[in-house]
Amino acid sequence: METVTVVLNVATQHVEAFEAGFRNHELPVWHDLKDRGLLVGATLNRLDISSRPVEGSVQYLVAVIFSTGEGHHAHDGHPGFEAWNRIADAYQVGQPLAFGGETVLQLGIPAD
């Protein structure tokens, strides 16, 4: 398994559009990858706690668990994600933070 997380800083005036766009564009990508056995689980989280807040933004944590590294590459090359990524860039202020790597321990997530 591989876990990838990204912290996005969405301008406060774009929060509704960002969340609606995420549902309309990224969620179908997640469903596609899950149906293909590449994605184990994923969440979009509005952050209430942050050690690196960005003024004028609402921060979101995107957390995705892929069955293998192949899933991560399939996600990033997915036409739906590529289109959404271009749209979502316009909503952001500040630089996103991205982290990822092999999942060492997990609980409550089926390991196919």
What role is predicted for each listed range?
Residues 2-11, 41-82:
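Short, well-ordered beta-strand segments in beta-rich or mixed alpha/beta enzyme
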Residues 5-8, 16, 105:
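N-terminal non-cleavable signal-anchor helices
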Residues 10, 29, 63, 99, ...:
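Generic detector of low-complexity/intrinsically disordered segments
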Residues 14-44:
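Short amphipathic alpha-helical segments
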Residues 19-22, 75-76, 85-88:
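Short, flexible helix/strand-to-coil boundary loops that buttress conserved ligand/catalytic motifs
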Residues 29-34, 66-70, 86-91:
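Glycine-rich loops and low-complexity Gly/Arg-rich segments
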Residues 38-59, 82-112:
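Glycine-rich beta-strand-turn "strand-cap" elements at beta-sheet edges
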